[in-house]
Amino acid sequence: MSMPATSTKTTKLATSLIDEYALLGWRAMLTEVNLSPKPGLVDRINCGAHKDMALEDFHRSALAIQGWLPRFIEFGACSAEMAPEAVLNGLRPIGMACEGDMFRATAGVNTHKGSIFSLGLLCAAIGRLLQLNQPVTPTTVCSTAASFCRGLTDRELRTNNARLTAGQRLYQQLGLTGARGEAEAGYPLVINHALPHYLTLLDQGLDPELALLDTLLLLMATNGDTNVASRGGEGGLRWLQREAQTLLQKGGIRTPADLDYLRQFDRECIERNLSPGGSADLLILTWFLAQI
């Protein structure tokens, strides 16, 4: 992907700045997948509750997606004068092209579809804020992303069509809004819970990997994860939330010895075929936002 040396034709953003944020997005995806052990998720130890994907698929996928993150930022900047509700339609073709490269990189395996949506939104929000000379903070980025998604849940989940998507079915049956609802609300699970929790643990001197694992537990305990519900129904989701909450109440992940609890949790998730992929996507955003 070729870009001008200093700025794009239609924006005033320096290529170096665009690439800096794109690199953070790539690092966020790698940080999440390499984090181990993660209950039910692909990591350096095993493939979790997945039989169709491995660690290397995620590495290839993240690299393919990194090449598209500057496009999201650029579009966010180019569309800065548009009404925010109009931005999402312009982002969709970029997201679909990015998704195509992901599938080509992984031979058809869906590794990061959720992250394309969420990181794409945040990158576009960053581009818009930079173009408008507004502060780029976790709060402003998430509120800007939310403005792009206004009405999204109504449009895409509240439908009476005979052929429901998995997301529409989970919304009708359990009231779960998934990635769309979290985005439209401005990522409250990240902004109000995961990010301050993670930053507090780092400020206390906790090892960054342990802090991130503990933050993953917090997300698993609070997130209405549609990935989990689609595999295990409401019962599977409630079980996973209870188990994560129990570990947090016992003190969470504070020492390497606590990793044994996560390994046992991982084994139980694999037995139940549960994978908290939605929480993993939110963890990617948490790490990403912690860097800006």
Swiss-Prot record:
A molecular function annotated in GO for this UniProt entry is:
triphosphoribosyl-dephospho-CoA synthase activity
Please give one Pfam family short name. Answer: CitG
| Gene3D superfamilies on file | Triphosphoribosyl-dephospho-CoA protein
Q: List the disulfide bonds.
A: none
The record lists the catalysed reaction(s) as: 3'-dephospho-CoA + ATP = 2'-(5''-triphospho-alpha-D-ribosyl)-3'-dephospho-CoA + adenine
One biological process term in Gene Ontology? prosthetic group biosynthetic process
Protein keywords: ATP-binding, Nucleotide-binding, Transferase
Q: What is its EC number?
A: 2.4.2.52
Q: Which enzyme class, named as a word? A: transferase
Q: Which PANTHER family match?
A: 2-(5''-TRIPHOSPHORIBOSYL)-3'-DEPHOSPHOCOENZYME-A SYNTHASE, TRIPHOSPHORIBOSYL-DEPHOSPHO-COA SYNTHASE
Which family is this sequence assigned to?
Answer: Belongs to the CitG/MdcB family.
Its function, per the record, reads:
Catalyzes the formation of 2-(5''-triphosphoribosyl)-3'-dephosphocoenzyme-A, the precursor of the prosthetic group of the holo-acyl carrier protein (gamma chain) of citrate lyase, from ATP and dephospho-CoA.
Protein name, as recorded = 2-(5''-triphosphoribosyl)-3'-dephosphocoenzyme-A synthase
Query: What does the organism's lineage look like at the top?
Result: Bacteria, Pseudomonadati, Pseudomonadota, Gammaproteobacteria, Enterobacterales
Gene for this chain = citG
